Design a protein with these regions (language model features):
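Amphipathic alpha-helical segments within well-ordered protein domains
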Residues: 76, 121-122, 146-150
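Short, solvent-exposed amphipathic helices
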Residues: 129, 133-140, 144-147
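Solvent-exposed, amphipathic alpha-helical segments
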Residues: 16, 20-28, 74-81, 120, ...
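Hydrophobic alpha-helical connector segments
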Residues: 62, 76-115, 163-166
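Amphipathic alpha-helical segments used for helix-helix packing
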Residues: 102-135, 179
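Hydrophobic/aromatic-rich alpha-helical bundle segments in the mid-to-C-terminal region
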Residues: 107, 131-135, 150-218
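Helix-turn-helix
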Residues: 13-16, 20-63
Length: 218
């Protein structure tokens, strides 16, 4: 379907609806994904929606599938190609904490995930559509972190504990940016904070060897 503007008709695609839904979630939560408000946002009738999606659930599933692929699987695939275990973790931190948690970021495909997008999903963790995807993505992230720490030389329990600690830091930064933004670092201070996270949570090889063996590094 098309929408009419000052320059005539512009074709709308399923991608347009997905992007509008992502914006709506960032601004108002999962409940904001509703056909009529999204149609108004895009400047079209509700009938346009049904050319691309069967119902609201199918749109929400498309949004969640896109988010899971771009914000979890694509990041894992990109960092997994780094052969050095410590550098792999550093690259992962750079990806996860790349942007200040105040303005959101644009994915590789051009979808803009607003500052609160993942927190809005967390708010809807009991939703029958959102919950399973959220738990799967979060579990995948923690499991991958554990793999990275084990590759760095940590024993399974310690690798698991560090993975949980790192993911808690990631989630916590997002929540603090939403709840007490005045206490969060910005610009150069945020870069320094990210570097502090890296130096604190990713040990050098000497300390890794000691932690992994329970004794002195050779």
């Amino acid at each position: 379907m098309t929408k009419k503007g000052a320059r005539g008709s512009v074709s709308l695609t399923a991608e347009d609806w997905v992007r509008a839904a992502v914006e709506a979630i960032s601004e108002g939560g999962v409940d904001a994904v509703a056909v009529e408000p999204l149609a108004k946002r895009l400047g079209v009738t509700k009938g346009s929606f049904y050319w691309h999606f069967k119902n609201r659930r199918s749109l929400l599933e498309a949004v969640l599938g896109r988010w899971e692929e771009e914000e979890t699987e694509a990041v894992i695939s990109a960092t997994a190609r780094v052969s050095d275990p410590r550098e792999r973790l550093v690259r992962l931190f750079d990806e996860a904490f790349a942007d200040e948690p105040f303005g959101g970021h644009t994915s590789g495909s051009g979808v803009f995930y607003g500052r609160d997008f993942e927190q809005r999903l967390s708010d809807a963790a009991d939703d029958p559509v959102v919950g399973p995807v959220l738990r799967r993505a979060s579990g995948r992230r923690v499991d991958y972190l554990e793999e990275c720490y084990r590759a760095l030389g940590f024993l399974p329990d310690e690798a698991w504990h560090r993975a949980l600690l790192v993911y808690a830091a990631y989630v916590g930064v997002q929540r603090l940016a939403r709840e007490v933004p005045s206490r969060m670092p910005r610009e150069d201070d945020y870069v320094a904070y990210r570097q502090h996270l890296i130096s604190t949570l990713i040990p050098d090889r000497t300390s890794t060897a000691a932690a992994g063996t329970g004794g002195e590094a050779e």
